[in-house]
Amino acid sequence: MKKNPIYLWVLLVLSALISSMSLFGILSPLPSKDALRASLANSGALTAQQLEDTVNYTYKVSESSHSIFNMLLIILSAILVVVAFVFLVRKNVQFANYTYVGYVLLAIVGLVYSYMNVQDAVQLIKDSALGLGMGALAKGTNILFIIINVLFLALVFYKMWRQQKDLTEEVEAEEAA
């Protein structure tokens, strides 16, 4: 390809930032319930039951983010981002696109896994209003991120289609000449 795929550079930089934050998240230690309770107790806006529910919810979500499956997803996604960068630097846009598509599909799998874990954590909340709010927030966040990933996927597929179409037109023009 003659053109520099700026769309892919932008998507990969955003993905690299997300992957690095996820890597730092799994490298940080799992907080204890006492530490969570102490940090939330200073807010003063929660009742004793809400405080305990929030501690249990936060601990369960943190625990699931440190699971082996989640760690494998994060490490694999970081590797895919690095590989896509390498392909892009070497001007192999097609393989960079394929690698990025793999990354996005893996990210969607990670979002579904995260959503299922958050729904399990919401079951620990006894306060119905708090549980409803946290469940709705988790659902909304996951839906938003899945939509963003699908849009990224659509953009990459569109660009791949355009690149193939341009390449076909170039070959036809050369054959006609």
Task: Give each language-model segment a name.
Residues K33-S67, S114-I143:
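Interfacial non-cytosolic loop connecting adjacent transmembrane helices
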Residues F69-F85:
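Hydrophobic alpha-helical transmembrane segments
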Residues V13, L72-I75, V101-L105, I147:
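Hydrophobic residues within alpha-helical transmembrane segments
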Residues M1-L12, K60-M71, R90-Y100, L132-N142:
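Membrane-water interface of alpha-helical transmembrane segments
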Residues K2-N4, V86-A96, A121-I125, N149-A177:
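Cytosolic juxtamembrane helix at the C-terminal end of the final transmembrane segment
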Residues K91-D127:
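Hydrophobic alpha-helical transmembrane segments of integral membrane proteins
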Residues N142-V150:
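Small-residue-rich transmembrane alpha-helices that serve as helix-helix interface/gating elements
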Residues M1-A38, L155-D166, A177:
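Cytosolic juxtamembrane helix and N-cap/initiation of the first transmembrane helix
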